[in-house]
A protein has these predicted regions:
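Bacterial Sec-dependent N-terminal signal peptides
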Residues: 1-22
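N-terminal, active-site-proximal structural segment of metallo-dependent hydrolase catalytic domains
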Residues: 18-103, 107-111, 117, 296, ...
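Active-site beta-strand/loop signature of hydrolases that rely on acidic residues for catalysis
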Residues: 28-30, 67-90, 122, 166, ...
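Extracytoplasmic/secreted cell-surface and envelope-processing proteins
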Residues: 35, 88-91, 115-118, 175-178, ...
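Second-shell loop/turn segments in exported
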Residues: 52-58, 75-81, 108-109, 140-141, ...
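Structured beta-strand-rich core segments of catalytic domains in phosphoester-bond hydrolases
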Residues: 84-163, 167-172
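Metal-dependent phosphoester/phosphodiester hydrolase catalytic core
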Residues: 159-190, 194
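Metal-dependent phosphoester-hydrolase catalytic domains
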Residues: 198-208, 216-333
């Protein structure tokens, strides 16, 4: 009798393990993943073989392999990215030796950004039944006439027939100054919110993941007030979002280091349904984190501990990115 009971218990455990998958969702700023080909419609002159950064094939493939090394170690099932110039650089990335066996599929659209850098989503083909996407371009009138990255939208149908809606973002930078440039980020955040409200109107239980480099922190107005993302699950409005990076920020962690201080420009936010865990897709509590390995960091004393980037000024450092990836896990039944 004991042997029979033990066999049944093992069988139930096996069934349960097959019925539920632990899925990694991540975002990673690729820091200027330009190809070496001149595009007359883009301001890519600095990243050409004869350009400012002497962006030749050797440096390009070193960059691809370095980024692939990070992605392979992270091993995401869904990865949002920004600062990708073209579908060529994206397909070259997922075709590297480190990533080819993962069979990543891309969602990518060329946008109106003046530098020609765009957002992307890649996913493991084995996870997905169907993927559809589009780009929401940002009206330049809301940005004082500037053109910026569009919002990448992907409607992913999982093998269990659940839908996840991804919004991949790269908000306007703080180059003009934090306060001076804030209205631009507030405007783009309002577009994100409008898209999400439209999804909620169609389905109050929509599974929505907002991710990106927001050039703002979790406690800035664009995130906290406009998008309505909070670090307190209990304080979430029905059409709001849970931002696990808020709590990580309070622990002193971060994806980007500025003047010795870590903070989160890169964030992943989840709709109410993903944290309520009442459906087949559920956020794994406290699973959000920054992916950081020693080999991804500077060792030179002056910059020790900073993300090891591709260039330090004009010097080719043969690094990865000036940002670290952010990640979390979902349980999918």
């Amino acid at each position: 009798m004991k042997k029979i009971f033990f066999a049944i218990a093992i069988s139930l455990l096996l069934i349960n393990s097959y019925a539920q998958q632990k899925v990694c969702v991540a975002f990673y700023n690729q820091e200027n993943l330009f190809d070496t080909i001149n595009d007359p419609n883009k301001n890519d002159e600095e990243f050409l073989p004869e350009g400012k950064y002497k962006w030749n094939s050797e440096r390009y493939y070193a960059k691809l392999n370095n980024m692939a090394k990070v992605i392979s170690a992270l091993n995401p099932d869904f990865l949002g990215m920004c600062e990708i110039e073209s579908i060529h650089s994206l397909t070259d990335l997922i075709s590297t030796n480190a990533l080819i066996t993962s069979n990543y599929q891309p969602v990518f659209f060329e946008g109106p950004d003046e530098r020609g850098i765009d957002n992307a989503l890649i996913f493991k083909k084995a996870m997905v039944k169907e993927a559809r996407g589009k780009i929401f371009t940002i009206n330049p009138e809301g940005l004082g006439g500037d053109k910026t990255r569009g919002i990448l939208f992907a409607n992913i149908t999982l093998n269990n027939n659940e839908h996840i809606y991804f919004l991949v973002n790269h908000f306007p930078s703080r180059r003009e100054g934090e306060k001076e440039s804030e209205p631009k980020r507030l405007y783009v955040a309002s577009v994100v919110k409008h898209i999400c409200d439209s999804l909620y109107k169609k389905d109050a239980k929509a599974n929505i993941i907002i991710m990106g480099d927001f050039n703002d922190y979790p406690n800035n107005a664009s995130i906290k007030e406009v998008i309505g993302a909070t670090g307190d699950v209990k304080a979430m409005p029905t059409n709001g979002f849970f931002n696990p990076m808020y709590n990580l920020m309070e622990q002193g962690k971060g994806s980007y280091r500025h003047k010795g201080e870590w903070n989160f420009l890169d964030q992943i936010m989840l709709s109410h349904n993903l944290v309520d865990c009442k459906t087949k897709v559920c956020y794994k509590t406290n699973s959000a984190d920054v992916f950081k390995q020693e080999w991804m960091l500077e060792t030179e004393e002056k910059y020790k501990g900073n993300p090891l980037r591709t260039f330090g000024g004009m010097k080719f450092l043969n690094g990865y990115s000036d940002h670290l990836p952010v990640m979390l896990y979902l349980d999918i039944k």
